[in-house]
C-alpha cells in the first residue's frame, strides 16, 4: 500500500471519528433538550391530580439520572393508568359542575320572574350542557349566572317591597329561616359595640339565608336590618355569608369562618373606629397584619419632593408604614386594572375580562381579592393557551400553503411532461409527413401528380406546425399563470414568516430582560456567558467576571420602603450601564446583585474599571426629604483560567464578593 493510500485512509478515519463526535454531541444535546422539555412539561402538568403529580415527580427524578431506561419502563405504565384515572375524575367533576349549574338555573327559573329575565335564564340553562364541557367556559358561565342571579334578586326585591309576597330567601330555604329572620334583634351599633372580637356563628339552623343587597355599590352605608343580624347570629358553624360589597353574595363552605366587624355595613355616621373606642377593646388579633396593623394613610408619591434644592432624580420616597387594606386598595386596583388592560385577550374572553374589570373597579375588598386573583390567573392561562392555539393555527396555515406550493410544483412538472409529449408528437408528425413526401416523390409518374402530392404533404406539415404552436402558446400561458400564483404565495409566506420571526424575537427579548431595571436578566446572563466562554476557548484572550452587590440594601427597603429600593436599583443600573463599553455585558442576577462580563480585558484594567463603577455609585446624590443618603456597593472580580466553566468562575467571584462584605463592605476583592 502506497504512502498516499495510507494517508488517504488515515484522513478518512480521522474524518469519520470527527463526524462521530459531532453526531454524539448532537445526540447528547437532543437528549438534554428532551430532558428539559419533559421536566418543564411535568411541572406544567402538576396541580390537577395527586397521582399524576407523584408520577411527574418520579419522572423528574428519573430524568436527572444517567440511566433512564429502567426507571422509565417501570414508570410509564403507572403514568398511563394515572392519566386515564385523572381523566375519568375530570369528567366526573365536569358532570358535577354541569349538574350544579343546572340546578341553580332551575331554582331561578322556579321563581316568578318577568319574561325578559326568564328568556336569558332558559337560554343559559340550555347552553350549560355544551359549554361546561370546556373548562375555560366555567368562569364565563359563573359570571353569567352571577349577573342573572343579581338581576333576579333585584327583581324579587322590588316585587317583595310592592306586594309583600314571600321573599326569595323564604321561597328558596323554607319557613324556618323566615321565622328566624322575623325575630327581633338589636341594632347594628349595639352589636358592634358589644364586642371587638369576630362574630362567631351561634345556634345551628338548617341552612343559611343568603343576604340580599340592601345598598347600591358605592352608596353610603345603611343600617343593618334586624332580620339580617338575626340571620347572621343563627347561621350554622360551617356556613358564613361573606359581607356584601356591591357584588353577589358568596357562601363559603367546608370550614368554619369568622365575620369581622369591619366587613359588615354600618349605619351612616358611625365608623368602625368609633365603635371600637366605645367598646374599649383592641383590634381583632386574627386580622392579617398587612390589613389592620397601621393607620390608613395615602402613599406619598415617589417623586414628591418637599421643595428642597436637591436633585429630583435621586430623591427617595418617604417610608410608608404597613397600611390597612383601604389605604392600599386603590394601588392594588390600579395595578390589577393595568395588568388586565395589558392582556391581549381573544374575543371569546372579553366578556369575562369586562366582568372582572367591573369587580375590580371601585368595589374590591379584602375578602374578594383572592377570588379576583384566581379569575385573573385563569385569564392569563387562557391567554397562554390562546397563544399556543395561534401558533398551532399558524403551523396549520403554513402546512396548507406548503401543500399548495407542492401542488403547484406538481402541476408545473405535469406541464413540463406535456411539453415533452407535445414535442415528441410534433417530431413524429414531421417525420411522417417527410416520409410520405419522399414516398410520393418516388411513386410519382408525372409532374402533375407529383405537384399534388407535394402540396398535400406541405399542407399537412403546416397544419402540424400550427397545432404545435397553438398548444405551445396555451401551455406557456398556463405555466405563466401558475408561476405568478406561486410567486405570490411564496411572497405571502415570506411576509408571514418575517412577521412571526419578529414576534418571536420580541417575546424572546422580553423574556431575557429584567422588567424593573431594563438590564438583561439571569437567563440572558447564562446565554451570554456560554457564548463568551465558547469564544474564549476558540480564539483565546482574556475574560473577566465581576459580581457587584449593593451594601445594606435590605436596610433601604426596611427604612424607606420597597418603592425607594426599586428606585435605587433602577438608578444604579443606569449608572453601571452607561459606564461600560459596548463589548461589555451587565445583567441583574437577582435582588440587589449584578454580574458584569468584561471580554478582552486584563485583570488590572478590570480592577480599575470596577473601582470607577464603585466610585460612581458612591457619588450618586441620593437623598431622602432633602437629607443626603450614602449608598455604596461591594464587588468581587476574577479572570477565567484555562478551560474553566462559567459556573466555577462565578463561584470564585462570588466568594471574593463575600470576602469584601466581611472585610467591611464598600470595597473590591480580586480572586
Curated annotation (Swiss-Prot):
The active-site annotation reads: 592
Q: What pathway, per the record?
A: Purine metabolism; 3',5'-cyclic di-GMP biosynthesis
Q: Which domain of life is it from?
A: Bacteria
Q: Which residues cross the membrane?
A: none
| Chain residues that bind Mg(2+) | 549, 592
**InterPro entries recorded:** DGCcoil, Diguanylate_Cyclase, GGDEF_dom, Nucleotide_cyclase, Rev_trsase/Diguanyl_cyclase
Q: How is the cofactor bound?
A: Binds 1 Mg(2+) ion per monomer.
The UniProt catalytic activity note for this protein reads: 2 GTP = 3',3'-c-di-GMP + 2 diphosphate
- Mention one GO biological process in which this protein takes part, according to its record: negative regulation of bacterial-type flagellum-dependent cell motility
Q: What does this protein do?
A: Catalyzes the synthesis of cyclic-di-GMP (c-di-GMP) via the condensation of 2 GTP molecules. Cyclic-di-GMP is a second messenger which controls cell surface-associated traits in bacteria. Localizes at the cell poles through interaction with FimV where it increases the local pools of c-di-GMP.
This protein's name: Diguanylate cyclase DgcP
Q: Which gene encodes it?
A: dgcP
